[in-house]
Amino acid sequence: MNASKFKQAIKNKASELGFFYCGFSKVAFLEEEAPRLETWLKNNYQGSMSYMANHFDKRLNPKLLVDDANTVISLLLNYHTETQQTDPLAPKISKYAYGEDYHFVIKDKLNELLSFMKQEIGAIEGRVFVDSAPVMDKVWAQKAGLGWMGKNTNLIHPKEGSFFFIAEIITDLVIEEDGPMKDYCGTCTKCIDACPTEAIVAPYVVDGSKCISHLTIELKDAVLPDQFRGKMDNWMFGCDVCQDVCPWNKFGKINNEKRFQPSAQLLDLNQNDWEDLEQETFQALFKNSAVKRTKFEGLKRNISFLK
């Protein structure tokens, strides 16, 4: 099987596994991203996410993560849904956390894809990534032609919008790159205008310390900063505002991944149920969920802050 057939076989298998899109980019040092990342960190836009300052060189050079790396295979897995929590007054959870933790779901699919590659192609080296190492996934996905970086810093695909997870396989296999996609945000500033905490401080620049997702998930302080009281738009875990207002998301298809579907119990909890939430219910609801990241105490803190 020649290189072009390898490429198509990988794309076909990725589609079979449920990935919406699969693209290829050539491994190289991310020269353009280096000063941007350095400035972002100097401005302390990482907030409490101190790990973002770690492994600076590895973030910019995949060869430091995978020996003899030649190609980044980027993949998109859709989580878009029109399902909503029943009570409009209930504290809100980001769509990506409605179902099973995406790390588990995607890693299973990536490992199956990598096994397929080794079976079909032979002795190759490869490593799978889904938020599990310092990889600039949106940058590589853009280079692979899977979308462009929106002004909210989310990757946007013209046919699917931005409600998808990004994952990678970095491999020593040499495959022709697909080439980057043009930016189609134009003069639109809907995401910037809609952000409840004004976290998008400039087009393509997010101050993570102001982002509701950071505040409700990453920030481990016992009390949330008072400057954000009344500005959280009733979000208790994550935030979808900058994606909900993005015009490109009107093209997004509904995901059909069974493991991403929310339980009826989760959707039906009302405002009082959430305020009275007990640890036993939390453990049952979020046993295999990304919401566990904030822990019971963190979720209760967030809910209390919204009152």
Name what the model sees in each region.
Residues 16, 190-216, 220, 232-259:
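Iron-sulfur cluster-binding cysteine motifs and their immediate structural context
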Residues 187:
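SIR2/sirtuin NAD+-dependent deacylase catalytic core
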Residues 108, 164, 206, 237, ...:
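Conserved active-site and cofactor/substrate-binding residues in soluble primary-metabolism enzymes
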Residues 40, 99, 143-144, 221, ...:
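Alpha-helix boundary/capping detector
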Residues 156-180, 208-228, 278-283:
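Short, charged low-complexity linear segments at domain edges
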Residues 1-184, 233-234:
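Auxiliary alpha/beta "docking" domains used to position bulky ligands
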Residues 49, 224-307:
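Alpha-helical scaffold domains
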